[in-house]
């Protein structure tokens, strides 16, 4: 599966607990894992006799929009800038159940394929007036933490990132996720 090799090492180590304390119950939760990923998780955690409960991945509060991307990076960044500003100038991104009723500034993520692209897109969005910072695996831990804290506190509006950012994020005023580059798999869109 897509998570097989890069599955968080801390989670992979949980199998040690299962082996050492066989009678202690273990619960694995995921919001978007495919059947194959679920099988991988069960195998990695040593869960042989277990119950699986699934809900629908159809989220009524999400909508998808596909736009043709401009051919140059500056033009594509201008498109993202315009889309973000146009969407929120009208009181919120259009779509079922999406609003800014929390009274906080809407924020979001712009996913890029490479670390280099995150830096280039971030620089261009900042030049266009969007408060943004980039996030990727080559940043020092303290720098990644700082970006996350600034975003969570509302001091920056957009994180331009690779897939190194995103899993486990729970921020109430996230109103958009832009894939600047096509995701590798449909799983990445759900994440």
Predicted regions and their residues:
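Helicase motor core with emphasis on the C-terminal RecA-like subdomain
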Residues: 1-191
């Amino acid at each position: 599966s897509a998570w097989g090799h890069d599955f968080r090492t801390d989670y992979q180590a949980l199998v040690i607990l299962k082996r050492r304390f066989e009678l202690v119950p273990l619960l694995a939760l995921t919001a978007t894992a495919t059947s194959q990923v679920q099988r991988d998780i069960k195998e990695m955690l040593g869960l042989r006799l277990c119950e699986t409960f699934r809900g629908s991945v159809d989220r009524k509060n999400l909508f998808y929009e596909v736009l043709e991307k401009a051919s140059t990076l500056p033009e594509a960044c201008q498109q993202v800038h315009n889309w973000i500003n146009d969407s929120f100038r009208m009181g919120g991104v259009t779509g079922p159940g999406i609003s800014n009723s929390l009274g906080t500034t809407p924020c979001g993520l712009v996913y890029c394929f490479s670390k280099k692209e995150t830096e280039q897109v971030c620089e261009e969005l900042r030049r266009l007036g969007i408060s943004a910072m980039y996030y990727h695996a080559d940043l020092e831990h303290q720098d990644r933490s700082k970006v996350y804290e600034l975003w969570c506190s509302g001091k920056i509006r957009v994180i331009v990132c690779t897939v190194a950012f995103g899993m486990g994020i729970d921020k109430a005023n996230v109103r958009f996720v832009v894939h600047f580059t096509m995701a590798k798999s449909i799983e990445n869109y759900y994440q």
